[in-house]
Design a protein with these regions (language model features):
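N-terminal "domain-start" segment that seeds a small globular fold
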Residues: 17-38, 123
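Short, internal strand/loop/helix patches
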Residues: 22, 94-143
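Thiol-/selenol-based redox modules, centered on thioredoxin-like
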Residues: 123-126, 130-177
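Thiol-based oxidoreductase modules, predominantly thioredoxin-like and allied folds used
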Residues: 74-91, 107-118
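Sec-dependent N-terminal signal peptides
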Residues: 3-13
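Amphipathic alpha-helical repeat scaffolds
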Residues: 29, 49-53
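Conserved helix-turn-beta segment immediately C-terminal to the redox Cys motif
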Residues: 43-44, 53, 57-81, 101-104
Length: 177
């Protein structure tokens, strides 16, 4: 019996993640509430690793504009703070929340700080990187404000470079709404 259980466990570990859906992944919002991405089922998602002290930080404005314009039509903009790039997100969740709210009027959903690369990379970012490779087929996130567009069925449609302005993604979003 233990042998059969061992084989079952091995097969589950070996092949389990291949069948994983984005909706199975747990996330923690900036206030510490844990839930699965199933919350966003049947919504288009724009998932972005963000930072408060980056040359691209002003993209918060464009992300918020997309949120305000398309939330009611089915878009969820999701911001995941990350401190892996030159420590450009050093604050606590409370610091980040306050900065985003006061400086950019951010109302789109923000999450707890995560790693996007390395062995401690969040499961969501492992999934995103495997689903949509970067330049030359690499998986590594190169910088803050890398963006992933996900359709209503949970399929990663496209990955955008940090330099891509949120307004430049608008047409792709409209095609999915």
């Amino acid at each position: 019996m233990r042998f059969i259980f061992g084989i079952f466990l091995f097969i589950t570990i070996l092949f389990g993640e291949e069948n994983m859906s984005i909706y199975d992944i747990e996330v923690k919002d900036i206030d510490g509430k844990v839930f699965t991405m199933k919350k966003y089922e049947n919504r288009v998602m724009l998932i972005v690793n963000v930072a408060s002290k980056c040359g691209f930080t002003n993209q918060y404005e464009g992300l918020e504009e997309l949120h305000k314009k398309y939330f009611d039509k089915g878009l969820s903009v999701l911001g995941f703070p990350c401190n892996q790039f030159l420590s450009q997100e050093p604050g606590t969740e409370e610091d980040i929340k306050e900065f985003c709210s006061l400086t950019y009027g951010v109302e789109f959903e923000m999450f707890s700080k995560i790693d996007v690369n390395g062995e401690n990379a969040h499961t969501l970012y492992k999934f995103l990187k495997e689903s949509s490779k970067g330049v030359l087929g690499t998986e590594t996130i190169k910088w803050n404000f890398t963006k992933f567009l996900v359709d209503k069925n949970g399929k990663v449609v496209k990955r955008y470079a940090p330099s891509t302005k949120p307004s430049d993604i608008e047409k792709d979003i409209l095609d999915l709404l």
